[in-house]
Amino acid sequence: MSNWRSKKLTQSAKHEACVSCGADDGTVVWAHSNEQRHGKGMGIKAHDLFGAYLCHKCHAAYDQGKVLHRLAWFMEQWEKSMIIACEKGYL
């Protein structure tokens, strides 16, 4: 079974600010979870549902393990992103 994908959701990032630091500098992307439980595998991104609006700096910090309590931090960003995505009709 393949992971769930949504071009509408992933492309919505270009219209959003970073949910972690608030940056609205053109570097915000839909940053996918790095958790296997969210569908992440070798060379496979997690389901699009498990992502967050993150700028380049915050995305890099997450990917490189530079945030404390990595899963808890990501889930906090995910929750904020899901509220935005639902309110704006991206989901």
What are the residue ranges of the model-derived segments?
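Short Cys/His-rich local motifs and their 1-3 flanking residues in nucleic-acid-associated proteins
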Residues: 23, 57-60
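Polybasic, low-complexity binding patches
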Residues: 39-49, 60-91
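Short, intrinsically disordered, charge-biased short linear motifs at domain edges
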Residues: 2-11, 39-46
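Short cysteine-rich loop/turn motifs with clustered Cys
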Residues: 4-31
